[in-house]
Amino acid sequence: MQLYAIETGHFKLDGGAMFGVVPKALWERTNPADQYNRIDMAARSLLIEDGNRLILIDTGLGNKQSDKFFSHYALWGGYDLTSSLTKVGFHPDDITDVVFTHLHFDHCGGAILKNKNGIYEPAFKNARFWSHKDHWQWAVEPNVREKASFLPENIQPIQESGQLNLLDSSATPLGFDVLLMDGHTEKQMLPVIEYKGKTIVFTADLIPTVGHLPIPYVMGYDTRPLLTLAEKSAFLKTAVEKDYLLFLEHDAHNELISLKNTEKGVRLDKTFTLDSYFH
């Protein structure tokens, strides 16, 4: 097995939305804001090469939206999904499986392209798409709070592709299991990957950045914030006890981290890249 960090594109989001009720004076210590109160964000996917399978976890925002849409997110950094795949020696047609931790647009947008005729089509024509069945139902019949994150131009083409597979438990046929979390959205899936003697958890939107390690630091986007608090507390307790490494999807400056116990709770120990840790 070989793992690759795939940068699909950096963007910015409102810091207040990303930290909910936590005062800016606290969260900006780890996540400094620009003049518009926006913080740096990554959309970092994980590519798993395992035998004859090439599995991509999440796909970023994609590039099919309008300039007006992207103007709200201040894209920066010059990364894109296809170029990042090429950099590690692969083509979108090589991907055998795409796992969506959940279907918010910044996690699944890169799975669908708009072709030269204006038609939406899969970016990974040879891949199977994987979502949790309860989350899929949540996305196709969205609540008012999340509706703006479940874009029809993402969801409908995935549904019509004939490539969609739905999971109904934490076990998967992909060589790894997932943790199911319901605080951010219904049945968010966090892949748990055994790699070179270590356990790596793709933390998606449970812990989007290092700044979200303190238990009360919960996103304003979460549908069930009290549940997020409980899920994060239990997860971090296990993670530090079992010496997990966390792969951060949204932290533009920290890719892979280890944890330690402190008098204030579980906090950052060290930060790495996949390459620096395993090579």
Identify the residue ranges that each predicted region occupies:
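Metal-dependent catalytic neighborhoods of phosphoester/phosphodiester hydrolases
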Residues: 108-119, 258-259
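Metallo-beta-lactamase
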Residues: 76-90, 94-106, 121-180, 185, ...
